[in-house]
Amino acid sequence: MTPDTADRPDATNANHRGAQILGAGAQAPNFSLHSTPDQRVSLEDFRGQAVVLAFYPADWSPVCGDQMALYNQVLPEFRRLGAELIGVSVDGVWCHTAFAGARNLHFPLLADFEPKGAVARSYGAYRDAEGVTERALFVIDGDGVIRWSHLSPIGVNPGADGILEALEGLHQHAGHTTAGAGAPS
């Protein structure tokens, strides 16, 4: 299982290349990216609700395809724990649309396409030399604070165990009140 970085903010935030992603306790940078040619999704749209933010290098690569398919299978558990899932890569919206359709994905894939990698850079999750995002995961609470992050080697599927542990901890800390937390009063 992946270590929980909520207690050890720097435990998994750097890789052998020296890449450094934002750690637990940091404010998650807001963003607004296209999910379709005519629709944008913003982190602010999820205020009051936990978010699993999954940066991945590229649609259609075997590891990314397996990772996103796994998260699609685990999506009901993420939602049971009060979280929504968002995938982000530098691929364009048409590529995402085809990829999501082929994989039957039921969560938004956002295009960090123009300016290329700007959102990934704000999270410390961009690989300049290759022009792709790192394989980086973030669990963000309803107040927009990163509660867990993990940087995986680019060719390794990080799985879902670390995400689930972080969400369970967040869910327990919130006193099991995350469901409906974003509802207007």
Residue ranges and their predicted role:
Residues 1-185:
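Chalcogenol-based redox active-site neighborhoods
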